[in-house]
From Swiss-Prot:
Catalytic reaction(s) noted: (1S,2R)-1-C-(indol-3-yl)glycerol 3-phosphate + L-serine = D-glyceraldehyde 3-phosphate + L-tryptophan + H2O
UniProt entry keywords in alphabetical sequence: Amino-acid biosynthesis, Aromatic amino acid biosynthesis, Lyase, Pyridoxal phosphate, Tryptophan biosynthesis
Pathway terms, separated by semicolons: Amino-acid biosynthesis; L-tryptophan biosynthesis; L-tryptophan from chorismate: step 5/5
GO cellular component assignments: cytoplasm
Cofactors named for this entry: pyridoxal 5'-phosphate
HAMAP family to which the protein is assigned, alphabetical: Trp_synth_beta
Protein name per the record: Tryptophan synthase beta chain
Subunit structure: Tetramer of two alpha and two beta chains.
Entry-annotated residues carrying N6-(pyridoxal phosphate)lysine: 86
Species whose genome carries this gene: Sodalis glossinidius (strain morsitans)
CDD domains tied to this protein: Trp-synth_B
Length: 396
């Protein structure tokens, strides 16, 4: 059986308890064989098209760029069934779980989007599903919690640590250590132990492939830059993957700047963390001086993660991709501007990427450029959060 490289440069690896090694090796073998199995690929493709609704549109913004020479396109992952890009790769992983004879799915979720995607794919394919979610995230994402339960998933609150995504990940891994013979751990981002970063990238890469084909149709050329938010990094690596070998295309990842990098209330682990071992991988992460994992912070639950996928760390280390941050305030402003001027309510996660695109446009209004923002999810789940913030300010 072909073995995949577990590393991206110095980043990645399989830093897990010995008990989980057979499960990871079984998963890698199943993935490698599925990649060359026409029947698996046909079923995956059929689900993406006829269940999830691919391809998603590439929408040209009509109003946000008025008075500039920029063309700003949005890759509309918000229109995918389930409301975000998460649906792509969970369908692939659910099919892998069935292929391996597993009957249960374990997942973690922050914003609830991966939880919803895990629940819908489990319901579709007849798998039992339990989802770990930080108690704090359950409070701020109640619509998604109800959606998960409606589709038959058990949602398990996690009260340890910061009661957010980091802690949900830890609990999910603990569960998997006890149940891996019957359960598949459906990791929600392009991070964690090998082979998850590679599997998730490959099951998300249609985002960039479609973008390239659609832009070729609209503009007959490649974009100048593709921009995506980065928490763990799955939507970004899905967008970047097809453009990595195109040096003329800038790859820009936008981390959560929270209340400002100087406050340490942020989640910008790639540019402001240190390399260490966490969540089964070697990658940059937010650490205290003593090397303890620090709590991350973001207005966006889905970006509230103290590390980042190893391929992003590698792309940063070789200078192929650029990583910057956008603050809560900048994301909130982008959220409101897209809603007001284009009639599209984006997820707060995606709003970070949009915020940086708007900064780029504002900095060089006379520059002729084509930018693509991966609108990774829709903002229905965030309207109560935004409403409460604006109400407290007397701004609605």
């Amino acid at each position: 059986m072909t073995r995949l490289n577990p590393y991206f440069g110095e980043f990645g690896g399989m830093y897990v308890p010995q008990i989980l090694m057979p499960a990871l090796i079984q998963l890698e073998d199943a993935f490698v064989s599925a990649q060359s199995d026409p029947a698996f690929q046909a079923e995956f493709s059929d689900l993406l098209t006829n269940y999830a609704g691919r391809p998603t549109p590439l929408t040209l913004c009509r109003n946000l760029t008025a008075g500039t020479r920029t063309k700003l396109y949005l890759k509309r992952e918000d229109l995918l069934h389930g409301g975000a890009h998460k649906t792509n790769q969970v369908l692939g992983q659910a099919l892998l779980a069935k292929r391996m004879g597993k009957t249960e799915i374990i997942a973690e979720t922050g914003a609830g989007q991966h939880g919803v995607a895990s629940a819908l794919s489990s319901a579709l394919l007849g798998l039992k599903c339990r989802i770990y979610m930080g108690a704090k995230d359950i409070e701020r994402q109640s619509p998604n919690v109800f959606r998960m339960r409606l589709m038959g998933a058990e949602v398990i609150p996690v009260h340890s640590g910061s009661s957010t995504l980091k802690d949900a990940c830890n609990e999910a891994l603990r569960d998997w250590s006890d149940s891996y013979e019957r359960a598949h751990y459906m990791l929600g981002t392009a991070a964690g132990p090998h082979p998850f970063p590679t599997i998730v990238r490959e099951f998300q890469r249609m985002i960039g492939e479609e973008t390239r084909a659609q832009l070729q149709e609209h503009e007959q050329r490649l974009p100048d830059a593709v921009i995506a938010c980065v928490g763990g990094g799955s939507n970004a690596i899905g967008m970047f993957a097809d453009f990595i070998d195109e040096p003329a295309v800038r790859l820009i990842g936008v981390e959560p700047g929270g209340l400002g990098i100087e406050t340490r209330q942020h989640g910008a682990s790639l540019k402001h963390g240190r390399t260490g071992i966490y969540f089964g991988m070697k990658s940059p992460m937010m650490q205290s001086a003593e090397g303890q994992i620090e709590e991350s912070y973001s207005i966006s639950a889905g970006l509230d993660f103290p590390s980042v996928g190893p391929q992003h760390a590698y792309l940063d280390s070789i200078g192929r991709a650029e990583y910057i941050s956008a603050t809560d305030e900048e994301a909130l402003d982008a959220f409101r501007r897209l809603s007001r001027h284009e009639g599209i309510i984006p997820a707060l996660e995606s709003s970070h990427a949009l915020a940086h695109a708007l900064r780029m446009i504002q900095a060089e209004p006379e520059k002729e450029q084509i930018l693509v923002v991966n609108l990774s999810g829709r903002g229905d789940k965030d309207i109560f959060t935004v409403h409460d913030i604006l109400k407290a300010r007397g701004d609605i």
